[in-house]
From Swiss-Prot:
Species of provenance: Neurospora crassa (strain ATCC 24698 / 74-OR23-1A / CBS 708.71 / DSM 1257 / FGSC 987)
Classification lineage: Eukaryota, Fungi, Dikarya, Ascomycota, Pezizomycotina
Gene (name only): cpd-7
Positions annotated as active site in the UniProt record: 51 (proton donor/acceptor), 146 (proton donor/acceptor)
Enzyme Commission number: 3.1.4.37
Gene Ontology CC: Golgi apparatus
Listed PANTHER family: 2',3'-CYCLIC-NUCLEOTIDE 3'-PHOSPHODIESTERASE
Enzymatic reactions: a nucleoside 2',3'-cyclic phosphate + H2O = a nucleoside 2'-phosphate + H(+)
Keyword terms, alphabetized: Golgi apparatus, Hydrolase
Domain of life: Eukaryota
Family label: Belongs to the 2H phosphoesterase superfamily. CPD1 family.
Entry's Gene Ontology molecular function annotations: 2',3'-cyclic-nucleotide 3'-phosphodiesterase activity
The protein's role, per its UniProt record: Involved in the metabolism of ADP-ribose 1',2'-cyclic phosphate which is produced as a consequence of tRNA splicing.
Biological processes, Gene Ontology terms: cyclic nucleotide metabolic process
Record-given protein name: 2',3'-cyclic-nucleotide 3'-phosphodiesterase
Protein localization: Golgi apparatus
Length: 212
């Protein structure tokens, strides 16, 4: 994945943090070894932290040798403004979106993702910029906010997706019902990570962090 990325991580003290971490690193690869790409040499246990990607494709030239200063210069919204709420489980025919939990796209999510894109890629001040507004619409249509659960090259059938959803819910992640009568759980706020995602997956570690 070219460049660096901005991720939103659940607060480390939140109950969902260890649940999602265990699902991603052990439970799902064990139950769905083919779909999780566990045989892929690029992947090892605990291969990525639970996160919602805010933006990718960020040039290292932007933050230079002081990534923390750059990250702190961005006027991030408060924790109360950012509410991550899970919807259902989906899959796309893309390695990094092989299986993921969709996140409800509300104004708070638009604001933080748009800000990340504006400052990290588009050279704009905030999500109101023309290029960022265009990107937000494209992002919404293509895949939107989500938390990846499995990377891999193997297509996942609808029946297997239902099995994944069952495992995820049994682990303690509440998903929204399709009719919209029940809202999924999630977290408020979190920690923004700046991660050089042009490295191997095993080396995806933050070089700067910012608590909302």
């Amino acid at each position: 994945m070219p460049g660096s990325s901005l991720w939103l991580i659940p607060p480390p003290s939140h109950p969902l943090y260890p649940i999602l971490s265990f699902l991603i690193s052990q439970h799902l690869p064990s139950d769905f070894p083919s779909e999780a790409g566990a045989a892929d040499a690029r992947l090892i246990p605990e291969f990525f932290a639970p996160h919602m990607t805010l933006s990718s494709g960020i040039s290292p030239d932007l933050y230079g040798d002081d990534p923390q200063r750059w990250l702190d210069s961005i006027p991030w919204p408060s924790a109360d403004e950012v509410q991550v709420r899970f919807e259902g489980i989906s899959s796309q025919d893309t390695y990094y979106r092989r299986c993921y939990a969709r996140v409800k796209l509300d104004e708070g999510i638009k604001k933080i993702a748009g800000l990340a894109r504006a400052r990290g890629v588009n050279g704009e001040d905030d999500a109101k910029g023309a290029k960022t507004q265009e990107w937000l619409e494209w992002w919404r249509k293509e895949f939107g906010p989500h938390v990846s659960l499995m990377y891999g090259d193997v297509p996942i059938s609808d029946d297997r997706l239902k099995e994944v959803a069952k495992v995820v819910e049994e682990a303690g992640v509440k998903l929204a019902e399709p009719e919209g009568n029940v809202e999924g759980n999630g977290w408020n706020g979190g920690v923004v990570w700046l991660v050089p995602t042009d490295r191997d997956i095993r080396d995806w570690k933050p070089i700067a962090k910012r608590v909302l």
